[in-house]
A protein has these predicted regions:
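Conserved helicase RecA-like core
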Residues: 1-178
């Protein structure tokens, strides 16, 4: 090669323009489902994705949401491809307003109507945080990312803030979405 140039790429940077990020501080995991129910009662959301850290947690939360009357479906790595594709197509078409997922959908899905992403479980990796929250606010629209944070999760939240040079404020009680 003649006259090669060297291109330096910075570490992954937070490129979440238009996405408001918040956390909700909770005492422990047992508070999460009740908090999620309260959130759905008080905040208007067109479509939302809720992320959990395990297949069992996704399945259990989906069952609980459906029992509470929420039009919800799930996608996780324990499902075969046809079942995942069916859930994705139905969610994208608007048959379901809530998609509950493991990190299998944190990259690569692009649904314009998703306005809110909820980290029911804070991701284990700072890199995954960006990909999860980035599912909202697509196509130039505004989006919201809300993370449930227990006392045990506070260090991970601080690690995310440091890594992305950002502050993730507590969700204000006056918050309205959509």
């Amino acid at each position: 090669m003649r006259n090669p140039i060297k291109i330096l790429v910075h570490a992954e940077m937070l490129t979440l323009e238009g996405i408001c990020q918040y956390h909700i501080g909770l005492d422990d995991d047992e508070c999460k489902f009740a908090t999620l129910q309260d959130l759905f009662k008080t905040i208007s959301m067109s479509q939302s994705i809720i992320y959990c850290n395990s297949v069992k947690r996704v399945a259990d939360l989906t069952e609980a949401m459906v029992l509470k009357g929420h039009p919800a479906c799930c996608i996780h790595s324990g499902m075969d491809k046809d079942a995942r594709d069916d859930a994705y197509v139905n969610f994208k078409a608007g048959k379901y307003r809530v998609l509950i997922s493991s990190d299998v959908t944190a990259r690569g899905i692009d649904i314009q109507q998703v306005s809110t992403v909820i980290n029911f479980d804070l991701p284990r990796s700072v890199h995954t945080y960006l990909h999860r929250i980035g599912r909202s606010g697509r196509w130039g629209r505004k989006g919201t990312g809300i993370s449930f944070v227990t006392r045990r999760d506070m260090k991970q939240l601080r690690d995310i803030e440091v890594f992305y040079s950002t502050t993730i404020c507590e969700l204000p009680s006056t918050f309205k979405s959509d």
